[in-house]
């Protein structure tokens, strides 16, 4: 049996690869989609909040690039210095991909009961707390 670290890395790589493929038709990547979702959670979000909330998902340079891409593509705007907000196009883009992401989530959890999923997440969360 392979150790948990092996499967964590393989799962993350598979999730990223499949999400990037799924989102490419919408001009997004997994990281870009995550950035839009973080900004969507508040009326205005600081860049530093995006970097902090997604620190486990990507390095600061990658996140900063994703923010820059979303700004350049018109999905985000800067209502104030160092503040981000979704544009109407950004909201439309998130809504357009929501159904596809839901199908992706079903695919990625096929054959896994809700209880098994919760157990897996709980175990990984506890392991993370043990190590931080």
Feature locations, PLM:
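Long, low-complexity, charged/polar intrinsically disordered regions in eukaryotic proteins
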Residues: 1-22
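Charged, amphipathic alpha-helical coiled-coil/dimerization segments
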Residues: 68-122
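N-terminal helix-turn-helix DNA-binding core of bacterial DNA-binding proteins
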Residues: 17-69
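Short alpha-helical
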Residues: 14, 30, 92
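C-terminal regulatory/oligomerization modules of transcriptional regulators
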Residues: 45-46, 118-132
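Residue-level detector of well-ordered alpha-helical segments, enriched
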Residues: 3, 7, 31, 35, ...
